[in-house]
């Protein structure tokens, strides 16, 4: 079985890890009407490692993979612990994935079901990635690809930082970085615009982990906890574009049903019968504007 899975594992290609773009939705004229994971209908912005403040790197590592800079792509103790939990549950309830494995999953298996063979393939590719790339490169690729909330405008660290705080990644503070790191475990449930209490508790958990791993002092932790999450957020959500969000949601759901793929995870071009001018007019009327 192991030999079979190894043969079936995709060939590692570092170029495939690049977040070169996002799924794009086109209107009836063939014009771009919506770009997933971007701000103001632009292209998804990728950051470099030099753009990342140390406080963000520390928060992400503390939250997702405390031995990230030490292991070779997968963490054996975590894998063993996860395997025991899965055996006890009688199902694959958790994978103990490292940051490198998460990057591989997002790239090679974005919509795949949890299976032991897929997990094995994930580990093989993660080890290959760790040999081919530096830790800094892996972390940067990961942060450019992952999503941080419910909105399509929170995919990738640059878009998420703009969406929540309306600032550049390099300007992130400790409490902001901890909040973003905390969302990765469950972006849907830790989106502060929808689940403020959950997001606050999770952020504080990450701050505690940062103390545990020696990244910050207890005083720095306490000071960061005193900053209310609601006071860090933009006064209003920065939307992707002026297109009718309901229409985008309907089309997105239809794409998922027809293809079994999620445009948030798998890059694709989506062509619709939407008349953008009509949609803009409807949105204006809905906002009470005079036509």
Residue ranges with predicted function:
Residues 16-19, 25-27, 51-55, 132-134, ...:
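Extracellular/periplasmic catalytic domains that process cell-envelope and extracellular macromolecules
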Residues 96-284:
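Non-catalytic, structured segments within soluble enzyme domains
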Residues 1-28, 32-33, 87:
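N-terminal type II signal-anchor transmembrane helix
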Residues 8, 72-91, 116-120, 124-127, ...:
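Alpha-helical membrane-targeting segments
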Residues 6-12, 40-49, 63, 123-124:
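N-terminal post-signal-peptidase region of extra-cytosolic proteins
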Residues 48-99, 152-158:
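Flexible, acidic/glycine-enriched loop-and-adjacent beta/alpha segments
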Residues 71, 289-291:
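Active-site phosphate-binding and catalytic loops of NTP-dependent enzymes
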């Amino acid at each position: 079985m192991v030999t079979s899975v190894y043969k079936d594992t995709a060939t590692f290609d570092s170029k495939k890890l690049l977040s070169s773009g996002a799924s794009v939705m086109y209107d009836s004229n063939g014009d771009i009407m919506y770009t997933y994971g971007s701000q103001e209908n632009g292209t998804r912005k990728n950051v470099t490692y030099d753009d990342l403040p140390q406080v963000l790197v520390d928060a992400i590592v503390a939250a997702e993979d405390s031995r990230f800079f030490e292991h070779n792509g997968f963490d054996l103790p975590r894998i063993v612990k996860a395997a025991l939990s899965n055996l006890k549950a009688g199902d694959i309830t958790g994978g103990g994935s490292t940051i490198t494995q998460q990057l591989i999953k997002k790239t090679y298996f974005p919509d795949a079901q949890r299976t032991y063979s897929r997990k094995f393939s994930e580990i093989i590719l993660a080890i290959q990635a760790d040999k081919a790339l530096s830790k800094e490169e892996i972390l940067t690729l990961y942060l450019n690809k992952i999503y941080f909330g419910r909105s399509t405008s929170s995919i990738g660290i640059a878009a998420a930082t703009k969406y929540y705080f309306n600032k550049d990644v390099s300007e992130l503070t400790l409490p902001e970085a901890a909040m973003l790191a905390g969302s990765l475990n469950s972006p849907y449930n830790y989106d502060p615009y929808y689940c403020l209490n959950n997001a606050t508790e999770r952020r504080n958990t990450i701050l505690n982990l940062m103390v545990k791993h020696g990244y910050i002092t207890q005083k720095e932790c306490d000071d960061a906890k005193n900053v209310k999450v609601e006071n860090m957020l933009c006064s209003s959500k920065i939307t992707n574009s002026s297109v009718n969000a309901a229409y985008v949601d309907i089309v997105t759901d239809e794409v998922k049903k027809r293809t079994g793929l999620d445009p948030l995870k798998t890059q694709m071009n989506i062509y619709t019968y939407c008349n953008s001018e009509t949609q803009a007019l409807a949105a204006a009327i809905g906002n009470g504007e005079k036509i």
